[in-house]
């Protein structure tokens, strides 16, 4: 199996080209690919499929006007509705491979179509075959669905439940700064099962200071990762709300880098880096 590897602020993905939709990845196969000791190693898998080959399987694909569908799987093999960093890497790959020649296009996801803008960059400036890019994704409306709580170890946290195409609990801890976030022992959270029957991603973040918040994330189906794109959108929304603001632009600092999130009443935009780091052939026989 040929593959590529990419990351967005060190949230990393295995990329599988399957334009005609001929490869049916099982959960066990995804787990094998994402295994960091026995496989390639990643936080998830991005299967690149022409949208027309997903219409019978995914309702959103049948309604899409985009050429390509992002079939995203978490490292545990589960299907996820949306992945913000994965969307940036997916879009970068489409543009780099020439599947989408224009710098502005849309891709189909299980959370609907997402408008994309890709700017190729390298150390010498713009280059059409660049390994890195800055990608903006129109994420749709970040919808606050209520208040909920999480227990992490012996600590209890309260935060905003935010739907960004997938569920999040974004916690802004008053009085915390970057040091407290870095020192947090972030383990698998206990969430309110009635509020989040399918689970959720948990973000722990600092209040806004000069338009910046620091964040860590525990992703549903993966564990702690160095970044989560949809999580940065949820966190920006919660940090603005904690500051008494409904809209604004926030720099979100995660262990893997920094992204910019613009929150508006009619939508949110996530902008950040993408890098393609490897291409190869996976020669180990995958489980059924």
Language-model features, listed with the residues they occupy:
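Glycine-rich beta-alpha junction loops
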Residues: 141-143, 164-168, 274
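A glycine-rich beta-to-alpha transition motif near the start of alpha/beta enzyme domains, typified by
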Residues: 1-131, 170-288
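Internal active-site segments that recognize and position negatively charged phosphoryl groups
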Residues: 151-180
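Active-site glycine-rich loop that binds ribose-phosphate moieties when present
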Residues: 123, 140-159, 185-186
